[in-house]
Design a protein with these regions (language model features):
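N-terminal prosegments of processed precursors
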Residues: 20-167, 287
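Short pre-active-site segment immediately N-terminal to the catalytic Zn-binding motif
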Residues: 332-352
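Residue-level detector of short, conserved catalytic/binding motifs and their immediate flanks
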Residues: 82, 128, 149, 219, ...
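Fold-level signature of zinc-dependent metallopeptidase catalytic domains
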Residues: 21-28, 32-53, 58, 170-326, ...
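Active-site recognition of the HExxH zinc-binding catalytic motif
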Residues: 303, 349-361
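Bacterial Sec-dependent N-terminal signal peptides
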Residues: 1-24
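Structured loops at beta-to-helix junctions and adjacent beta-edge loops in soluble globular domains
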Residues: 98, 133, 154, 224, ...
Length: 361
């Protein structure tokens, strides 16, 4: 019988994370000031061009535009270290960033239809982690793409989200920066690892078979995006993959700050109805996803991302050395129909939590 219990990962709580994790600060401290390429990327604005009342969702926020020329320069040159000023609540936060290697040219990117998986040429973003300059106890993860930025700053005072002010408008060049403690809406997602059905589920698969040794140096993820996520990103494989890699950069940054190395080995996007479409909760989705993964996958852990409203996330516990069936997790209800605002801190929390179950953190 496979044991599933509820574990509260310390990585979930930003105030625990930033108090304990110092790895990234140490890496940044090792870069001389002249080693940072300074990029003037953001320009604060006072009036939104989006037809949306942000005060319905937030009590405080900052709006900005981004220089497309500078953004393209950041993506194309992919400097080892950057310094970027972020407008925030009438002032600026200076981000000191260094290049992340959680996704590389060797990572695999596929789109899946009724005929199977097909590789596609994915234009990699520029992925970074770092800190806020002169602010101890901070941790930054941020990804730059040709027409998008996905970022989050973990601070003792809350999580600061950086993203397009309307994530449903792919053409928008307006960004919003806000502390998630000022959100007026509540995310009711929950972790399903305490589901009694999982605690009593008797596996059909022998966990002593197909067991493999996982490297202690880096945990590699196979990431799958369901059809609903693909639809929500305008049926764009690239935009959906940007969402996945941008999200996992945030997750990877949080783990790295606690000296746990992770990487994305493959991202697969469903472009047709997926095998999980009939599942109405995270429990059923996990069983379906685990069944799909039982034959093996490209990575150490498999993670399904879904924007369907399934109630949150769920995962098997402590499975790094188990059969492929169990090395899986589901993170659903990712910003599903709550607001056009970017809610990357919620998404990051769900994925980090469920991946932590798999690793027994």
């Amino acid at each position: 019988m496979k044991k599933i219990i509820l574990v509260c990962s310390a990585l979930l709580c930003h105030f625990i994370l930033v108090a304990q994790g110092k790895y990234i600060q140490g890496k940044i401290d090792g870069i001389p000031q002249e080693g940072f390429a300074i990029k003037n990327l953001f320009n604060p604005i006072s009036v939104s061009s989006e037809n949306y009342d942000f005060t319905k969702d937030l009590s405080q926020y900052t709006l900005a535009t981004v220089s497309s020329d500078v953004l393209n320069e950041v993506v194309n040159t992919y400097e080892y270290a950057l310094e970027v000023d972020i407008p925030f609540e009438g002032s600026f936060l200076t981000l000191q960033l260094m290049k992340s290697n959680f996704v590389t040219e060797s990572s695999v990117f596929t789109a899946q239809n009724n005929h199977g998986k097909e590789n596609f040429k994915y234009p990699l973003g520029a992925y970074y982690y770092g800190v806020v300059k002169n602010m101890p106890g901070t941790c930054v993860g941020i990804s730059f793409f040709a027409n998008d930025i996905i970022g989050m700053i973990a601070m003792p005072e809350g999580n600061i989200v950086i993203g397009k002010s309307n994530v449903k408008n792919a053409l928008s060049e307006e960004y919003i920066i806000y502390n998630d403690k000022y959100l007026k809406i509540e995310n009711t997602s929950r972790c399903g690892a305490d589901d009694d059905r999982l605690k009593t589920l008797i596996p059909k698969y022998d966990t002593k078979k197909a067991v493999r040794t996982i490297t202690t140096n880096c945990v590699k993820f196979y990431v799958e995006c369901d059809y609903k996520t693909y639809q929500d990103f305008g049926n764009s494989v690239v935009s959906t993959t940007n969402f996945a890699t941008g999200l996992f950069n945030l997750v990877s940054t949080l783990y790295l700050n606690d000296s746990v190395s992770t990487a994305v080995q493959q991202v697969n996007v469903w472009t047709v109805t997926d095998p999980y479409a009939a599942d109405m909760n995270t429990y059923d989705a996990l069983v379906s996803f685990s069944t799909q993964m039982q034959g093996g996958f490209n990575g150490d852990l498999a993670h399904l991302l879904s924007k369907r409203s399934l109630g949150g996330g769920i995962a098997w516990l402590d499975v790094l050395c188990d059969a492929a069936y169990y090395r899986s997790a589901v993170s659903a209800s990712l910003s599903a129909n709550l607001t056009p605002l970017p809610t990357y801190s919620w998404n990051t929390m769900v994925v980090t939590h469920e991946a932590g179950h798999n690793m027994a953190s």
